[in-house]
């Protein structure tokens, strides 16, 4: 059974000292939607815009076309092309259960959507249910992006919010520990479930695969700490940033569970 979700738009952090909270952005999304739903986007105005047929546009076109040659078996691509001041950096991170052809399909959708929503912007980011795509004229490899962040949460509340909140944080914290443990195959992604009486709680955490495991843990710990603000007692919720994200529901929401 699906539940409707309302994204709460969070203002981008203009600097580490100030956080401005913008007007809430309301949008209904079906949680159990098997399609690759658009979630949110942000066009960065600080980096300016490029002109049609400019070197920057040429480098961007080269990168996006070249990315389609990838097999997406890792579900992650970070690349750059061109010389300053027209260097373009691009990153694609697909959800942990959406590698291969699903990831490639999400790239195609995200590329066209970002260009439509942020026309000629040198920098921007777009989130879909199954991937994140980011472009920028400056390098951001291995760096936490906490300037781009938003919440999504269920409109329904559980009967015992206090206990549910404790269990939710415990599950997400456990998944974070597993996702960031040292191993030969560091995916920075983990899913799991927890029995809550007659129902189950399902969770997922993920970081961009260019982050060090310690940086990933820092990122996840930070957004999990926002549970009270985003999802207090809600049946489902998500916090998504430009570097990491988590999601929990009271029903399975992934194609596969690790």
Curated annotation (Swiss-Prot):
Q: Which UniProt keywords apply?
A: Repeat, Secreted, Signal
**Where does the signal sequence lie?**
1-31
Q: What is its main location?
A: secreted
Q: Which residues form the Gnk2-homologous domain?
A: 38-140, 146-253
Q: Name the domain of life this protein comes from.
A: Eukaryota
**Where does it localize?**
Secreted
Glycoprotein found in the keyword field: no
A cellular component term, taken from the record's GO annotations: extracellular region
The record ties this protein, via InterPro entries, to:
CRR_secretory_protein (IPR050581), GNK2 (IPR002902), GNK2_sf (IPR038408)
Is-annotated flag, keyword Translocase?
A: no
The entry's family comment says: Belongs to the cysteine-rich repeat secretory protein family.
Q: What is this protein called?
A: Putative cysteine-rich repeat secretory protein 61
Native organism: Arabidopsis thaliana (Mouse-ear cress)
The beginning of the lineage is:
Eukaryota, Viridiplantae, Streptophyta, Embryophyta, Tracheophyta
């Amino acid at each position: 059974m699906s539940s409707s979700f309302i994204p709460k738009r969070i203002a981008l952090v203009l600097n580490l000292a100030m956080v401005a909270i913008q007007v809430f952005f309301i949008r209904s999304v079906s949680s159990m939607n098997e399609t690759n739903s658009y979630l949110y986007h942000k066009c960065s105005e600080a980096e300016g815009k490029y002109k049609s047929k400019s070197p920057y546009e040429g480098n961007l076109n080269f990168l996006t076309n070249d990315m389609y040659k990838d097999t997406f078996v890792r579900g992650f691509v970070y690349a750059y092309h061109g010389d300053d001041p027209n260097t373009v950096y691009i990153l694609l991170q697909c959800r942990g259960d959406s590698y291969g052809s699903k990831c490639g399909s999400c790239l195609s959708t995200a590329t066209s959507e970002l260009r439509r929503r942020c026309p000629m912007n040198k920098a921007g980011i777009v989130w879909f249910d199954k991937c994140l795509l980011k472009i920028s004229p400056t390098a951001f490899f291995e760096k936490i992006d906490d300037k781009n962040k938003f919440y999504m949460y269920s409109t329904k509340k559980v009967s015992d919010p206090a206990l549910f909140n404790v269990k939710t944080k415990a599950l997400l914290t456990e998944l974070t520990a597993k996702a960031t443990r040292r191993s030969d195959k560091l995916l920075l992604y983990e899913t799991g479930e927890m029995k809550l009486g007659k129902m189950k709680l399902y969770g997922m955490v993920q970081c961009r695969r260019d982050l060090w495991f310690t940086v990933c843990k820092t990122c996840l710990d930070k957004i999990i700490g926002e549970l009270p603000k985003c999802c207090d007692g809600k049946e489902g919720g998500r916090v998504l940033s430009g570097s990491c994200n988590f999601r929990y529901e009271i029903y399975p929401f992934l194609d596969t569970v690790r």
